[in-house]
């Protein structure tokens, strides 16, 4: 099994993910969490790794705040687009770009990083535990992992609301090989277990798009966006809504020493 490379659909990826209210909402909720993490880590400038960072939307915003950001991605096209976007925003001096898969990034880093962003990648990799172990190895003790993954429970709920009963009964097989539908939707309980077994201390969990995708009237996603964002913000960090999110964002700390877990 190979990990997904988006060279063939980079433009479609950008348009479908970030050119919609679902992308706008995803970034808004994500940055609420990231702002809290940054506040807790203090005023110092951080070394940040965006592993599988794609076009760099989050990495560039981090660089605009003065942090030094390393972005790696398996897709050469995504790296090129990220470089162009960084130039346009005037933050190229705060960024480094590495063309490699997330699980290979350790060989490109000389010193550990303070914060790792690993967003919407875990659902595309064939060996998730290996990737998480690599990320552990390049994060300094006391550093933080920001992990966002595609939620298998959210996928099931979305299909049930749509009335796709046969598809759910068949186990929700992937319909096309080369699409934006993730290869490996993740069970959140399994992901939490992987993190805890590796030694991470989970700090917080947030459901991302806990209501947006389930609206009967799709025009409300756009026409009522501000009200929707307010309600998503109110409920997204409590159950059962966390587990209904289309994505789940987990923040986890690497202890100062593993024996403190």
Swiss-Prot record:
GO terms for molecular function: tRNA (5-carboxymethoxyuridine(34)-5-O)-methyltransferase activity. Its EC number is 2.1.1.-. InterPro entries: Cmo5U_methylTrfase, Methyltranfer_dom, SAM-dependent_MTases_sf. It catalyses: 5-carboxymethoxyuridine(34) in tRNA + S-adenosyl-L-methionine = 5-methoxycarbonylmethoxyuridine(34) in tRNA + S-adenosyl-L-homocysteine. S-adenosyl-L-methionine binds at residues 26, 52-53, 73, 102-103, 119. Keywords: Methyltransferase, S-adenosyl-L-methionine, Transferase, tRNA processing. One of its GO terms (biological process) is methylation. Coiled coil: none annotated. The keyword Methyltransferase applies. Signal peptide: none annotated. Homodimer. HAMAP family: tRNA_methyltr_CmoM. Catalyzes the methylation of 5-carboxymethoxyuridine (cmo5U) to form 5-methoxycarbonylmethoxyuridine (mcmo5U) at position 34 in tRNAs. Belongs to the class I-like SAM-binding methyltransferase superfamily. CmoM family. This is tRNA 5-carboxymethoxyuridine methyltransferase. It comes from Escherichia coli O157:H7. The lineage of its organism: Bacteria, Pseudomonadati, Pseudomonadota, Gammaproteobacteria, Enterobacterales. The gene is cmoM.
């Amino acid at each position: 099994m190979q990990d997904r490379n988006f060279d063939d659909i980079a433009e479609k990826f950008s348009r479908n993910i970030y050119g919609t209210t679902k992308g706008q909402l995803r970034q808004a909720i994500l940055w609420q969490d990231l702002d809290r993490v940054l506040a807790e880590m203090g005023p110092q400038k951080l070394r940040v790794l965006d592993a599988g960072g794609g076009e760099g939307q989050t990495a560039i915003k981090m660089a605009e705040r003065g942090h030094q950001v390393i972005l790696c991605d398996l897709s050469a096209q995504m790296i090129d687009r990220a470089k162009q976007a960084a130039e346009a925003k005037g933050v190229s001096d705060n960024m480094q770009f590495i063309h490699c898969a997330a699980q290979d990034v350790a060989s490109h880093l000389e010193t550990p990083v303070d914060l790792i962003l690993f967003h919407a990648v875990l659902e595309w990799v064939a060996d998730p535990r290996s990737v998480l172990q690599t990320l552990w190895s390049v994060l300094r003790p006391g550093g933080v992992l920001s992990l966002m993954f595609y939620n298998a429970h959210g996928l099931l709920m979305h299909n049930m609301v749509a009335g796709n009963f046969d598809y759910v009964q068949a186990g929700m097989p992937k319909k096309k090989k080369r699409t934006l539908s993730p290869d490996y939707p993740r069970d959140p309980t399994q992901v939490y277990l992987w993190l805890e077994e590796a030694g991470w201390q989970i700090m917080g969990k947030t459901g991302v798009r806990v209501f947006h995708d389930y609206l009967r009237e799709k025009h409300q996603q756009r026409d009522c966006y501000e009200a929707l964002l307010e309600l998503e913000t109110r409920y997204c960090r409590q159950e059962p809504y966390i587990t209904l999110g289309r994505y789940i964002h987990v923040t986890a700390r690497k202890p100062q020493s593993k024996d403190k877990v």
